[in-house]
């Protein structure tokens, strides 16, 4: 079977000219727009996206049978069944160039390892934000770049897989993500 496809940035911008392409795809799709890209996809302003992020993301994911990660402060994930969850990890220091590229690569990496799109997406979004939170705690709230986030991943993955994540992170409400809507 074919692997799911992850589409970001200019791929999303290209789709905005012909959304019917999404209906012809027979493999699972994961789209990772930021609010501006999402606005182009649905033909509204970024401000309108921000006012009704959850409903717009859920409707789009359901209408086009895709998984959608609407990036931003409190990134959210919507699935083809019309469910959504909000990720609470991450911080404002992550609003810099290349962070979305890292996230897209993480999602694709988890899919390539055999995770289904929902788990791959939830895990990647969570770890992406967690790495940003660890960097903010160690270095301060701003001034890190995408490369710093990538450098943090091996240590975080090892800690998570071995159950050695610090207790303060394991018990923090921000690090539990379930379908909420």
Spell out what each predicted region is:
Residues 1-89, 160-181:
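Glycine-rich phosphate/dinucleotide-binding loop and adjoining beta-alpha-beta core of small-molecule
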Residues 7, 68, 86-89, 93-97, ...:
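Short glycine- and Lys/Arg-enriched binding-loop motifs that mark or flank ligand-binding interfaces
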Residues 13, 74, 92, 99-103, ...:
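Gly/Ser/Thr-rich beta-alpha loop segments that engage phosphate groups in nucleotides
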Residues 40, 96-127:
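Short, small-residue alpha-helix embedded
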Residues 41-42, 88-94, 104, 108, ...:
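Short beta-alpha connecting loops at secondary-structure transitions
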Residues 44-52, 114-122, 140-144:
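Short, charged, surface-exposed loops that flank catalytic or proteolytic processing sites
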Residues 55-58, 85, 104-105, 118, ...:
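Feature representing long, continuous alpha-helical segments
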Residues 130-181:
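Charged C-terminal helix
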């Amino acid at each position: 079977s074919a692997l799911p496809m992850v589409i970001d940035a200019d791929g999303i911008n290209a789709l905005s000219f012909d959304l019917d392409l999404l209906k012809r795809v027979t493999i699972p799709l994961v789209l990772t727009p930021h609010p501006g890209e999402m606005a182009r996809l649905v033909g509204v302003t970024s401000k309108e996206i921000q006012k009704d992020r959850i409903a717009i993301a859920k409707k789009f994911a359901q209408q086009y049978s895709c998984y959608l990660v609407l990036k931003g402060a409190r990134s959210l994930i919507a699935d083809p069944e019309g469910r959504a969850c909000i990720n609470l990890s991450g911080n404002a220091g992550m609003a810099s160039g290349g962070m979305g590229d890292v996230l897209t690569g993480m999602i694709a990496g988890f899919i390539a390892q055999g995770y289904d799109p929902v788990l791959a997406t939830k895990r990647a979004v969570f770890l992406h934000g967690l790495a940003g939170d660890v960097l903010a705690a160690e270095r301060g709230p701003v001034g890190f770049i995408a490369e710093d986030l990538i450098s943090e991943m091996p240590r975080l993955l090892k800690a998570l897989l071995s159950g050695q994540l610090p207790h303060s992170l394991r018990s923090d409400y921000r690090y539990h993500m379930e379908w909420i809507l």
